[in-house]
UniProtKB/Swiss-Prot annotation:
Organism: Streptomyces coelicolor (strain ATCC BAA-471 / A3(2) / M145)
Pfam families: CLP_protease
Keywords on record: Cytoplasm, Hydrolase, Protease, Serine protease
Reaction(s) catalysed (UniProt annotation): Hydrolysis of proteins to small peptides in the presence of ATP and magnesium. alpha-casein is the usual test substrate. In the absence of ATP, only oligopeptides shorter than five residues are hydrolyzed (such as succinyl-Leu-Tyr-|-NHMec, and Leu-Tyr-Leu-|-Tyr-Trp, in which cleavage of the -Tyr-|-Leu- and -Tyr-|-Trp bonds also occurs)
Active-site positions on this chain: 114, 139
PROSITE patterns with a match to the protein in the record: CLP_PROTEASE_HIS, CLP_PROTEASE_SER
EC number(s) given by UniProt: 3.4.21.92
Name under which the protein is recorded: ATP-dependent Clp protease proteolytic subunit 2
Location of the protein in the cell: Cytoplasm
Amino acid sequence: MRAASQGRYTGPQAESRYVIPRFVERTSQGVREYDPYAKLFEERVIFLGVQIDDASANDVMAQLLCLESMDPDRDISVYINSPGGSFTALTAIYDTMQYVKPDVQTVCMGQAASAAAVLLAAGTPGKRMALPNARVLIHQPYSETGRGQVSDLEIAANEILRMRSQLEEMLAKHSTTPVEKIREDIERDKILTAEDALSYGLIDQIITTRKMDNSSLR
């Protein structure tokens, strides 16, 4: 791979992933090398583009807390293209989003499925968005345990019922849909277009361009 200093791409090798380019930017302090994620972070944008597990949840929480400490009065944007994941990792990010002082704008690009759908809806009211061809998928949580003695399985069954009830309450809190309707809908996968998600109350608007009044994001 050829060097970035010669105007060419460098980045990690991966068979199933487009190689992330790195670029050099000259500043008054000298030369700095960036990747797109670092540049987005400087603009107070967190990109959640992976499955939600403990590792990715820790990354997102760390960025939320760091951006709050840097400026507690400026909005944080979370761009989402995720298939979802662990319920416990979801609740960790969710609680942190509610905990930090800045408003959290959420934008669905591609898909916000399962746990990611809850994070999309959990953004600051009025600042939850989706691109026109995005989709949102909601369903009941899956068991994160399933082996052991009969007594252990009973504990796991009770826990998944608790998680389901908690998920229903989260979705009802951050949407305009009654909890009874949500309880019925998540029996199986419920796939929503951007327009459907807007009607459901999971987002506040569908956007086609980033050209908007930046003062609303402060």
